[in-house]
Amino acid sequence: MSHFKSAEEAAAAGKYVRTVRSFVKREGRLTKGQAAAIERLWPTVGLTLENGRLDLAMVFGREAPVTLEIGFGMGHSLVEMAANAPERDFIGIEVHEPGVGACLMAAEEAGVENFRVFHEDAVEVLKQCIPDNSLNCVQIFFPDPWHKKRHHKRRIVQPEFVKLLIQKIETGGVIHLATDWENYAEHMLEVLNDEPRLTNLSSSGDYVPRPENRPKTKFERRGEGKGHGVWDLQFKTNKSATLLG
């Protein structure tokens, strides 16, 4: 067991400590269409850790607000939101390769060009590729709830991860989370409320109604038909707030 309190502390001492991952990377099996879309479109829209720290204006060929979606699944929300907001640019991160392929197929069919994608670990992308204060919005919709208590440490929404997000988001930018697991929603709310540099945009101090710009998924509609709830959270960054501790 390591005596270092964090990966950063270990790195400073020249040591490597394996960090807890919030995902299991599953390559899965690509359909022919997904494989063809990746081969055809990746040179244009694909990004990797090897790109290093990005100049987002150069990546997109313009200055525009940038939304980052972490864990875009099959890409439905990413593509629809990019299509509906051509004045914005979008970056998606997904570890499941068939999801990347499906996203590229959908984007090509919709004629969407204001997006880029990573097939990487979100934490590494944030640390290595995303400049500080460069994002206008970070959205994470229906992340893995890791519902067993012993797996809660694998949930992506944790205090250290939120600190990393704030570092990458401009002042006044937004973190938007959504989940259909009430226990995870409560966990998210607690983590975000405990961060002094975030302000809850909910008038009731907890959750917000689903924003019109967040598309409903088929899974979400099915769940609603069965009486399942969905919880959206939106918090705004306020970096002038004093950090406690």
Swiss-Prot record:
Catalytic residues, chain numbering: D144
Compositionally biased region (Basic and acidic residues): 209-225
Cited Gene3D superfamilies: Vaccinia Virus protein VP39
GO MF, one example: tRNA (guanine(46)-N7)-methyltransferase activity
Residues reported in the UniProt entry to bind substrate: K148, D180, T217, K218, F219, E220
EC numbers: 2.1.1.33
Reactions that this protein is recorded to catalyse: guanosine(46) in tRNA + S-adenosyl-L-methionine = N(7)-methylguanosine(46) in tRNA + S-adenosyl-L-homocysteine
UniProtKB keywords: Methyltransferase, S-adenosyl-L-methionine, Transferase, tRNA processing
Domain of life: Bacteria
Any one Pfam family match given in the protein's UniProt record, by short name: Methyltransf_4
GO cellular component, one term: tRNA methyltransferase complex
Similarity comment: family membership: Belongs to the class I-like SAM-binding methyltransferase superfamily. TrmB family.
Pathway: tRNA modification; N(7)-methylguanine-tRNA biosynthesis
Keyword Methyltransferase assigned: yes
Keyword tRNA processing: yes
Gene behind the chain: trmB
Location of the region described as Disordered in the Swiss-Prot/TrEMBL record: 200-225
The protein's role, per its UniProt record: Catalyzes the formation of N(7)-methylguanine at position 46 (m7G46) in tRNA.
Protein's name according to its UniProt entry: tRNA (guanine-N(7)-)-methyltransferase
Listed PANTHER family: 3-DEOXY-D-MANNO-OCTULOSONIC-ACID TRANSFERASE/TRNA GUANINE-N 7 - -METHYLTRANSFERASE, PENTACOTRIPEPTIDE-REPEAT REGION OF PRORP DOMAIN-CONTAINING PROTEIN
Residues holding S-adenosyl-L-methionine: E69, E94, D121, D144
PROSITE patterns noted in UniProt: SAM_MT_TRMB (PS51625)
